[in-house]
């Protein structure tokens, strides 16, 4: 969704005979990637599978809002009166097979068959190719002001061969939450969240250097 702010009182003598439009993105776009750190990737007999992702928020992600087409500003639902107009928390990301974006597949490795995204030490997209999440921005171009206003809750399995010659992997399941930081989900910006899965923690790297109305910026947060 792109909107051009109003151009008023244009005249041929001052506009060179042309009407110009300044189009800008008014939503915020999100994609997600994941990889393993060296504590896991160094073991060829261990695999990591992401089985689910949800977003938790403190009534920040609106499900509906009103945009002023004149100046491209948003009016968010009033709290607490219109709390029902915000997305549920947690907001579960659905699989592509369920009209969502999460690229869940069937690994079929050493008896492990849970629908999941297999990851390794090379960052790979968790979404189906050319699929993104689009959100109504939080507080216009400001984005989040508190690091815990939006969190990612990641559920993943670590499957490993318990002994030499074993044909069935032993599986341990985990769910960890990580704050996505401040200044995110801002109007006109596109974000790539890269999660690094370790044995004891998840680290998230946030990049917004895309061809939207943005400048490059990286942030690192670690959750233990």
Regions from the language model: what does each represent?
Residues 1-224:
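Extracytoplasmic cysteine-anchoring/structural motifs
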